[in-house]
A protein has these predicted regions:
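N-terminal amphipathic, basic helical "cap/leader" segment at the start of enzyme domains
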Residues: 1-103, 202-205
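Conserved hydrophobic/aromatic beta-strand scaffold that supports enzyme active sites
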Residues: 22, 107-109, 175-177, 199
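Small-aliphatic-rich amphipathic alpha-helix that forms the alpha element of a beta-alpha
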Residues: 51, 108, 114-163
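Short secondary-structure junction motifs
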Residues: 60-63, 143, 173
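A general secondary-structure junction signal
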Residues: 67-69, 112, 180
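Short Asp/Glu-rich motifs
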Residues: 70, 159-161, 167-168
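A glycine-rich helix N-cap at a beta->alpha junction
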Residues: 98-100, 164-190
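Phosphate/diphosphate-binding glycine-rich loops and adjacent basic-rich segments that engage nucleotide
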Residues: 186-205
Length: 205
C-alpha cells in the first residue's frame, strides 16, 4: 500500500483567521486607483505559482500569464491605437485606446489555451480552471499588498493584439492591472439575487 504523502503544514489558528479576513477584503481596483510601484517580476512569479494551484482536471494547465514591462508599453499602445483605427473609431477614441496601454503600474495578459478534443475534460471545465487561476493570482497579489483588476474590452478580440500575445490555439482572456492601492478598500455592496449557500434537499418521490 502506497504511503500517503504529507500535506502542507496547517497555519496556526490565528494566522489562518487573519488570512481569511484578508482575503475577504479583496475587491477589484481600477487603474485610476492604483499607484506605483507595481509588482516586481518576482512578485508576479510568486502570484503565478499560486495561480498554478487552481483545480485542473487532466493537468492541462490551460492558461499562462504574459507580463508587459514598462519598456513594452509604447509598442502595446501602437497596437491598441491601430486596432481602434481599423474599427473605424473616431480620433478621440483612438487616443483613448492608445492610453489604455499605460493603465496601471503593473500589466499582464491572461492567455487561455482551451482544448475542445479532450474527452474527459470538457471545455467548460477548462474555462473554470482559467478563471480559478485568475482568482488565485488576484488573491496572491492582494496578500502581497497589491490591488488589481481584470479588464477586457475590444482589445482582447483584436486579431493583431491576439497574434502578438497568443499562439494559434490560444485566446486572450483578459488584461490584469496591478499596483498599490491609492485609498483604503471600499468593497461594492452586492444585493443578493439568490442564496449564496444553501443545503440541497432531494425532492420526494
Amino acid at each position: 500500500m502506497q504511503a500517503v504523502p504529507p500535506g502542507p503544514d496547517p497555519l496556526p489558528a490565528s494566522a489562518g483567521q487573519d488570512l481569511l479576513h484578508l482575503l475577504g477584503q479583496r475587491f477589484s481596483t481600477g487603474p485610476k486607483y492604483l499607484a506605483a510601484p507595481g509588482p516586481t517580476m518576482e512578485a508576479w512569479m510568486r502570484a503565478a505559482r499560486v495561480a498554478e494551484r487552481a483545480p485542473d482536471h487532466g493537468a492541462l494547465r490551460p492558461f499562462r500569464f504574459v507580463i508587459v514591462g514598462d519598456d513594452q508599453r509604447l509598442a502595446l499602445s501602437e497596437l491598441f491605437a491601430q486596432g481602434a483605427l481599423e474599427r473605424g473609431q473616431p480620433p478621440d477614441d483612438v487616443e483613448r485606446a492608445r492610453a489604455r496601454a499605460f493603465n496601471g503600474p503593473g500589466l499582464a495578459a491572461l492567455v487561455a489555451r482551451i482544448c475542445p478534443d479532450v474527452p474527459d475534460v470538457p471545455v467548460h471545465e477548462q474555462w473554470m480552471c482559467v478563471g480559478a487561476g485568475l482568482m488565485n493570482l488576484l488573491n496572491a497579489l492582494h496578500v502581497m499588498g497589491f490591488a488589481a483588476k481584470s479588464l477586457s474590452g475590444l482589445s482582447v478580440s483584436d486579431e493583431a493584439i491576439k497574434a502578438a500575445f497568443c499562439d494559434s490555439d490560444e485566446s486572450l482572456a483578459c488584461w490584469i492591472v496591478a499596483g498599490r492601492p491609492r485609498q483604503p478598500a471600499h468593497p461594492r455592496q452586492r444585493e443578493p439575487v439568490a442564496p449564496l449557500l444553501e443545503t440541497w434537499r432531494p425532492t420526494k418521490a
